[in-house]
């Protein structure tokens, strides 16, 4: 039974609101390329994303989380548990308000950067700029720049290779039958490895590749090769090639949703778990346990967020940046997953949201600069750079008010 503590009740409500905002903005990215390419309808997308986001959050979300995300401020300098409670509430509200504003305008922003901004905001109000781990902040800023650039370059190169091996051949359907098992198998090596690292929270890249990635890729390669032996109807050869990648794109997008639920639910339930642990046990360590029912609350909030408001960001990423087809959508999912995997292995800071958007831009650039909606890209980039300061300012104001009335 949930203890009847006003701080716990308030934080649960705010945590659910943050999870809803994550679903409406960040989680919508997972299915945006599939919707933009016409692989599935928006209604199908929100249903699939909602189920997989909840599954990822509840069954694969970490049962131990950080009280202060990414060690962005020094927890040893916060000795008063009430400060951590007020700060958690302020960070949640600051991040949630900014996410709702960004989502209203269809701008895909990083939920991790939003909650980090909220934490920095209340941290500076409480302990001054010295409380912030500026080395970590530099890594966060680097991720703003590196993620979209690396995602764009990788997607550009992958799509050029895919276009040369399949779409520009004399018989695209025949080439797709020959080459798509290779491309799809390669994608599932990455997906299998990512499942081990991001969903099962494994620590060894080599174990992930050898035990999960390669076996998954080989199985999918064999199955795809067998399925493609069927004859395609006499249609436009380019459309025939796109059809081959359509169903696969739904699977790759679905994986992104599952992994997102497992990882980013911590942005909503981390502060909730911190307040719950302090209020019920008097503990205020750097890490706290996360009860399953809190994971369920976060997963439910994300799922409802996708279903009720996710269409705005889906439309921006899937339709407004550049025109997408199934091969382009597949390229984006494959490229984003690969870049995130490599970055995790190298210990580089990276934003999945920024990487996906960068990959969309990269695929568009493979067709020429004119294929990109530059005004939309400009608005997105501006929103990325104001995420941390805006969330921080809002959280700082809320924290100051809580200190005055607390």
From Swiss-Prot:
Keywords: Cell membrane, Membrane, Phosphate transport, Transmembrane, Transmembrane helix, Transport
Cellular compartments annotated: Cell membrane
Lipid bilayer topology: Multi-pass membrane protein
Keyword Transmembrane helix found: yes
Domain of life, source organism: Archaea
Gene Ontology CC annotation, any one: plasma membrane
GO biological process, one term: phosphate ion transmembrane transport
Transmembrane segments annotated in the record for this chain: 2-22, 45-65, 83-103, 114-134, 140-160, 182-202, 207-227, 265-285, 288-308, 330-350, 385-405
GO terms of molecular function: phosphate transmembrane transporter activity
Function summary: Potential transporter for phosphate.
Protein family (similarity comment): Belongs to the inorganic phosphate transporter (PiT) (TC 2.A.20) family.
UniProt protein name: Putative phosphate permease PH0640
Species this protein is from: Pyrococcus horikoshii (strain ATCC 700860 / DSM 12428 / JCM 9974 / NBRC 100139 / OT-3)
